[in-house]
Amino acid sequence: MEAITVMELKTLLDSAPDEIALVDVRNPAEAEVASIEGSHLVPLASLESGEAIDRVRGLAEGRRLLVHCKLGGRSARAVELLSQQGIAATNVTGGIDAWSQHVDPAIPRY
């Protein structure tokens, strides 16, 4: 499984934001507490049910698809599910928790 760190994600967001699509697979309540600017909320359950596959396919069109969650476990599962649907995706290791520790301490940890 392809993976990147939050520092690598920050570099991509700063240098080529139009070339990536960042998907957040946490629950809506979690996203209300903390989120990375520009991310698209697509809860893991909606990928597991299949209802959001086409939406993510559209987001990924012509862009590198990056997936994050709180710590990296749910996003790894999402990357697996997307791969099974023929959609290439990269896991953001450490998730938003690592983002708040290493990139933007203003993002609350929960």
Over which residues does each language-model region extend?
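Short, surface-exposed ligand- or partner-binding patches at beta-edge/loop junctions that are enriched
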Residues: 67-68
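Rhodanese-like catalytic fold shared by cysteine-dependent sulfurtransferases
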Residues: 1-21, 25-64, 73-110
